Amino acid sequence: KGAVDNTSLIVVRDTSGSMGSSATGTTQSCFDIAKALALFFSEMLPKGSFANSWIEFNSVAKMHSWKGSTPYEKWTNDKSKYIGSTNFQSVIKLFCDIKQKGVNESEFPTGILCISDSEFNPTQLNSTNVKAALFSLRNAGFSKDYVNNFKIVLWNLQSNHHGSTTGKKFETFGNVKNVFYFSGYDGSTVAFLTGSDQH
């Protein structure tokens, strides 16, 4: 109940060291909750180069495909661990690298759903991670239309890894088009971004 039919947002899952901390209000780790949400949303990606996929990022980003025929098998076959820093820009670099390998822009997700405790590495020249990401996409040859409509959903799993201020940073100054902030544990809350009906 409350699930979306499909989404063109690919899940970007933070597996940095701080994700091993408990998520606020639960006995579960941010790592496990992010894994569950990643599995939930990747089931809804349309067919194509990114179907059944998710992106892991810590100090670097990697593309993964779930292995198995059931959610349980996919969960148990995922051997990722929490380690390293939270290099959000490595996700954008991965997008750019894939494009350079010849994948057509029309096959790319229209945005990312980043599940993290939001302790991103700082960017250079005091730019926000969002601004730096869009700049990199443009430089990699993505069309103006693609970049201007690229959605960045930052889903914060509040932890206390660095104390009470963990995950309370914003990556924008004021309202920015196609950038959304969420928190919590119910995947249906992003249905309005997908154009899908809820059930």
How should each PLM-predicted stretch be described?
Residues 1-199:
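Acidic, glycine-rich A-domain
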